[in-house]
Amino acid sequence: MGIVKSIARLDQRTRRRLWLPLLTATIVLVYPFQTTVVPAWHIRVIDDTGLAVAGMKVTEHWQHNSLESIGHEDFQTTDRDGRVSFPARPIRSSLFARGLAPLLKTLKEGNRALLGRYASVVVWGNRNYETGVAIYKPGEVPIGEIVISRAK
């Protein structure tokens, strides 16, 4: 309440000069800006001989660990060319939340706190093939091809 009292003590002319910058700063701090957790991910699943594998289940997992407490997933099946495409995964969050959420998470979880973006895909669902995994590294182009081996 000290700030409110200080502002109330200012003369009317000074208050008129301050209201627009204060309003602008408040809007900038609380406006939910969009960030991409993981860009669109286009994957081709092939076997160890280089042939496309149709009918494989592919699950994409993603989460912005700094801003979300739970992750998300989406499931698709490869087409006859062994391809699946997942759209970009955006999240909206204010600058205030982006500053406060990681701090609170670190205070709560200590050095075990996971921060930042995470995404991966898992290729599975056919007994003839082993499971395949690819992990997205923020700032890089997602892996476009996953090679799975025949089960032995």
Q: Which residue ranges define each predicted feature?
A:
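Residue-level detector of short, conserved catalytic/binding motifs and their immediate flanks
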Residues: W41, M56, D74
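Short, acidic Ser/Thr/Gly-rich low-complexity loop/linker segments typical of extracellular
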Residues: S66-R92
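Short, solvent-exposed cationic patches
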Residues: Q12-T14, D74-R83, L107-R112
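Extended low-complexity, serine/threonine- and proline-enriched intrinsically disordered segments
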Residues: M56-W62, S120-V123
